[in-house]
Amino acid sequence: MSVIRPSPIPIPRCRSQVLHRRLYSIQLIQRRRRRWNPRSEVEDTAIESTARSPEAAGGKMVVELVGAFNEVTERMNSVWLSTSSSRLLFKALKLSIPILQSLPLASDGRSPLSKALSLSIILADLQMDAEVISASILSEVVDANAISIYEVRDHIGTGTAHLLHEIFRVKNIPFKVDVLDDETAASLRKFYLTYYDIRAVIMDLVSKLDEMRHLDHLPRYRQQILSLEVLKIYSPLAHAVGANHLSLELEDISFRYLFPCSYIYLDSWLRGHENGSKPLIDVYKEQLHRSLKDDLVLAEMVNDVYIKGRYKSRYSMMKKLLRDGRKPEEVNDVLGLRVILMPNSVVNDVEVGEKACYRTSEIIRSLWKEIPHRTKDYIARPKENGYRSLHMAVDVSDSDQIRPLMEIQIRTMDMDGSANAGTASHSLYKGGLTDPKEAKRLKAIMLAAADLAAIRLKDISSNKHQSFKTTTNQRDRVFCLLDKNGDGMISIEELMEVMEELGAPGEDAEEMMQLLDSNSDGSLSSDEFDTFQKQVEFMRKWEDRDNEYKSLLDEKLHDLPHQDTTGLIQLYNKELEDRLSTH
């Protein structure tokens, strides 16, 4: 494949460099352990072979490849993780990672690889399929002119290339924010959904969300222009395709940049609903979860209970305050819980599930005061679109403080799945598409696109490549993708092939094989590769923790300089920044 690549530019503090420092640190710790406990030497042999950091470029890329694949697939719905879809995602990552690592940092300070992985994670959380996620990753490479759509078609597949073509069509829609009145914005949203692949629209929405999360480097005027575009076009569009959480986050970020003072006021008030250092919604969530788990009657009907908590979005709250003239404490549904029950009966799970929902409502009434006129029984009387759930509102005020009402939704796992699946058709109206026939047609387009992707990625059984079982975990999946001949071992030839696909010399494969092959038999077993992946997972978690601690330290240190009369805090602050910037 002929790929035009820019001159390699060193990327400071890239993830793979940090990962390999962690590997070396693990090795030192294990050596110290061995001095105190010689008997641990045999037990640590396999891990030590992995802990020796493979400093070659190929080894670093394999670490990045395995880590990225696992991070994305563990968030995906198992329905999408067939053999074909896993291979597709793996091929896209192999093609993209070497190129993305060689590109310069973006204007927001992130590496292109970091941005590509952020997009893929959002899409995985939205339960998009491997083809959409692969196209999203590759779009960053194509956008940098490092590879063409035609090359993607030849090396990845026609379906992915088509999606890339669609996403760039969507990105190039011309419009100006100064003419985006309500009618024009509604027409533009309808144009999006009528003339473009719905999956490309979702990819564009995710790209816009990622952009909105990193606006601080832009001038104030540009931040406001983008935020207005999001409120007029992208947030309602996200609602129209059923991505409600994405829509709410887009609204809140836009609100923060357009109306910073109002946002701070509402945000401070919402955060004031805390019990000590813990958000109030978490307190209620834990209280309800304990009560449900302790109830013996409910325990006979359900295997498990899940509870989700949420605060009303800042933008949604602002609209209610301005529209109705209410005070913040008079806004209902600021707090919300959703109880999802998993019935333990297979034969009569519908009947048992309904009884469990009503039993849950009785337990809730024993904890808080119910507001009767706010109760809506959509289980006994489902909505026209088939929606079934039990809605309640309760008063959680105590003797010390009056609090807003809390809304609680109660449903079974099946009811929740049906509600989410039906979100798209219902939200097409809220997204500004008020024609029922048009909404029904657009829903059919969305379902057809999903069916087409499922058919395209359907597994074809063969003797050479076995389908993944539903119980296959993330580590086994990567091992099977590298074990191309299916003999249960990764040979030096198979490892070398991956290295070459990543653009690294074959010698790196030999070095990495020596480091990972603990029994020196010339190949990697699933256990040896599993040890390697555990190290990768361990290091990625510690890198995230390190960044978290750095932020906390920065916050603490920046709050204290005015109290420092000796200059020691400023000195320590500078030394800390210098150390962190060199590691």
UniProtKB/Swiss-Prot annotation:
Function summary: Possesses calcium-dependent ppGpp (guanosine 3'-diphosphate 5'-diphosphate) synthetase activity in vitro and is able to functionally complement E.coli relA mutants. Plays an important role in the timing adjustment of pistil and pollen maturation required for successful pollination. May be involved in a rapid plant ppGpp-mediated response to pathogens and other stresses.
Protein name per the record: Probable GTP diphosphokinase CRSH, chloroplastic
Subcellular localization, as worded in the UniProt entry: Plastid, Chloroplast
Single GO BP term: guanosine tetraphosphate metabolic process
Record-listed E.C. numbers: 2.7.6.5
Domain remark in the UniProt entry: The calcium-binding sites of the 2 EF-hand domains are required for enzyme activity.
UniProt: Ca(2+) 2 binding residues: 517, 519, 521, 523, 528
Further information: Plants silencing CRSH have abnormally small siliques with few seeds, due to altered timing of pistil and pollen maturation and unsuccessful pollination.
Gene that encodes the chain: CRSH
Family: Belongs to the RelA/SpoT family.
Organism: Arabidopsis thaliana
UniProt note on tissues of expression: Expressed in shoots, cotyledons, rosette and cauline leaves, stems, sepals, pistils and siliques.
Record flagged with keyword GTP-binding: yes
